[in-house]
């Protein structure tokens, strides 16, 4: 394989605040795989001596490029395609399954214990429910490391999946498999349907037999996105919910103050799919243009949660989040664009902080990893070239682009430390789909890339296989989408990295905070008298440990009973809004 150029240092100018920092993401190696058609990689499995990349390939181009297998079965859709490579990204083998595949709703892979066997989940056309394989439904397989099928199962309804066609999954606590998708009808395998779109989960044992199934929904439109095993037993589910359906179904009502917006929803299930609790988060404005949703929720060591997804709005749980206003194609009064969104909750599911990241175009986050220092590493995508996305400058991303992969790092309070776009010059043309964390510094990413036709436009893309995937008979250059795998290393020196502050008026610069360090009390002296000044003391886990409101020019915070360490002191009134570090000795 070909080793790419190493990016040992990237200087990022953070536009919000004008703070210059050093962000060092090194691309250690990368490679691309595909045929002459479109290949969509959606997942991977990493083993000691091989890697499986899983997604789908264009049926009409099977047998071209690296797609050496012919998957032309009679069923419609693009087949699931698996590429087996070594850790130098050299090809070992590849194979496909023609009975499983449609758009990007195929090929999610899950390792089964310590066996070299795997579950695959996706969508296909199984012959179930007397529908004669006419509609898309859930398909699950169990395979070995050589692609041999141990069993295949299909589940669903006669009417088939809802519009998004995506069927995903998660390993069950008992070694089986959970499959989930969204449906607009009931019957057959689905025992309950509440109306207008529900999420459905079916649990299989290791032999592919159904253990249990459950529907999550209301009379409104409810969409299920992700299921995660809980370390406390049962499962955590992320959804979006429409509160118009609050009065019917198995989900507790969202707040009546959020009457028209799609809201982020977390649902806790027990081991057999019964709802234990659910919690809603989102906007409070009576405007259907505002909304939010979660792609992932993780449990943290302190008992709390971190959620990542996307959001657009400025009220409710999004108030003060820093959402960047934007509209689709910059059309005045057009549809609002989303930011990547992180929501930090305590053990009782109360909001600790809510932060948005992005620019004036669409930005998303789908994967978050807690760091040992309390911060978070986040992976997603961006179409923006402004706002927080200062690194778009190194790709010269156009206002209208095809998306760049985006990775950014925060501290424990959600403050952005650095960010990095990874893609091609001009149009980006890269999408992250799956990430495996090796440690706090190293990650393997699987995704999709459109190989550049010229080194001038390649940017971060440096695959030696691109020529193999180009169709020579295509008058437009044959630059189709391909599987993409890359290994990156975070080389930032966090001992010298400073948290960026928002721009401050000149009068804020003379706010006095003393003594600092302190072993008991910290005093605050403002430049002018204020009727109401709020102070919050926040620990490095992002928790507010003390609050106080005062009038006048000065006051103090007691810290003598707090553990020694670094804290963030946030001060806000009509003239002042700033955060400063305070050391408790």
Task: Please name every model-derived segment.
Residues 503-514, 518-585:
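C-terminal outer-membrane/trafficking sorting elements
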Residues 1-27, 499, 577-579:
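Bacterial Sec-dependent N-terminal signal peptides
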Residues 4-7, 86, 143-146, 252, ...:
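Residue-level detector of intrinsically disordered/flexible regions characterized by low predicted structural confidence
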Residues 15-16, 20, 60, 89, ...:
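N-terminal processing/targeting junctions
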Residues 22-503:
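A sequence-level/structural motif corresponding to short, flexible coil/turn segments enriched
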Residues 3, 20-22, 435, 541, ...:
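Intrinsically disordered, low-complexity regions enriched for glutamine and histidine
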Residues 5, 10, 22, 70, ...:
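Serine/threonine-rich, low-complexity intrinsically disordered segments
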């Amino acid at each position: 394989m070909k080793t790419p150029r190493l990016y040992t240092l990237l200087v990022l100018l953070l536009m919000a605040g004008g703070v210059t920092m050093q962000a060092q993401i090194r691309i250690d190696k990368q490679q691309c795989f595909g045929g002459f058609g479109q290949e969509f990689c959606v997942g991977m499995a990493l083993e000691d001596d091989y890697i499986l990349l899983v997604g789908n390939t264009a049926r009409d181009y099977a047998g071209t490029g690296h797609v050496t297998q012919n998957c032309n079965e009679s069923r419609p859709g693009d087949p699931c395609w698996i590429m087996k490579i070594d850790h130098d990204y050299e090809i070992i083998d590849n194979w496909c399954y023609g009975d499983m595949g449609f758009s990007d709703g195929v090929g999610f892979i899950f390792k089964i214990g310590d066996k070299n066997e795997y579950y695959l989940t996706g969508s296909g056309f199984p012959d179930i429910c007397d529908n004669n394989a006419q509609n898309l439904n859930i398909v699950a397989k169990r395979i070995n490391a050589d692609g041999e099928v141990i069993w295949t199962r299909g589940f669903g309804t006669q009417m088939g999946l809802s519009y998004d066609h995506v069927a995903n999954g998660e390993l069950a606590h008992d070694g089986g498999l959970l499959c989930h998708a969204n449906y607009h009808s009931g019957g057959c395998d689905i025992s309950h349907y509440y109306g207008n779109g529900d999420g459905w989960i079916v649990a299989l044992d290791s032999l592919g037999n159904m253990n249990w199934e459950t529907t999550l929904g209301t009379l409104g439109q409810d969409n299920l996105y992700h299921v995660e095993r809980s370390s406390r037993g049962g499962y955590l589910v992320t959804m979006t919910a429409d509160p118009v359906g609050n009065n019917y179904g198995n989900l507790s009502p969202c707040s009546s103050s959020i009457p028209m917006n799609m809201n982020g929803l977390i649902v806790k299930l027990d081991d057999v799919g019964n709802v234990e609790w659910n919690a809603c988060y989102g906007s409070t404005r009576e405007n259907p243009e505002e909304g939010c949703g979660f792609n992932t929720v993780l449990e943290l060591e302190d008992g709390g949660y971190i959620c990542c997804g996307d959001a657009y709005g400025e009220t409710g749980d999004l108030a003060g989040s820093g959402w960047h206003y934007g509209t689709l194609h910059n059309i005045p009064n057009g549809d609002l664009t989303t930011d990547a969104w992180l929501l930090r909750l305590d053990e009782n599911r109360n909001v600790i902080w809510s932060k948005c990241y992005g620019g004036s175009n669409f930005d998303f986050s789908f994967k978050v990893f807690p760091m040992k220092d309390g911060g978070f590493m986040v992976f997603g995508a961006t179409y923006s070239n402004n706002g927080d996305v200062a690194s778009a400058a190194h790709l010269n991303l156009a206002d209208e682009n095809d998306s760049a992969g985006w990775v950014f790092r925060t501290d424990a309070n959600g403050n952005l430390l650095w960010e990095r776009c990874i893609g091609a010059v001009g149009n980006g043309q890269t999408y992250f789909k799956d990430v495996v964390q090796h440690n706090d510094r190293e990650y393997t990413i699987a995704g999709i890339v459109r190989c550049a036709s010229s080194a001038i436009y390649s940017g971060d893309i440096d695959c030696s296989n691109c020529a193999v995937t180009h169709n020579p008979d295509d008058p437009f250059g044959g630059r189709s989408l391909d599987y993409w795998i890359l290994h990156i290393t975070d080389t930032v020196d966090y001992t010298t990295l400073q948290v960026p502050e928002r721009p401050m008026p000149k009068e804020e610069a003379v706010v006095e905070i003393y003594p600092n360090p302190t072993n008991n009390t910290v005093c605050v002296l403002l430049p002018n008298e204020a009727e109401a000044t709020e102070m919050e003391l926040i620990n490095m886990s992002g928790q507010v440990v003390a609050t106080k409101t005062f009038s006048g020019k000065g006051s103090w915070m007691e810290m003598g009973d707090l553990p020694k360490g670094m804290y963030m002191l946030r001060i806000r009134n009509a003239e002042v809004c700033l955060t400063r570090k305070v050391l408790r000795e």
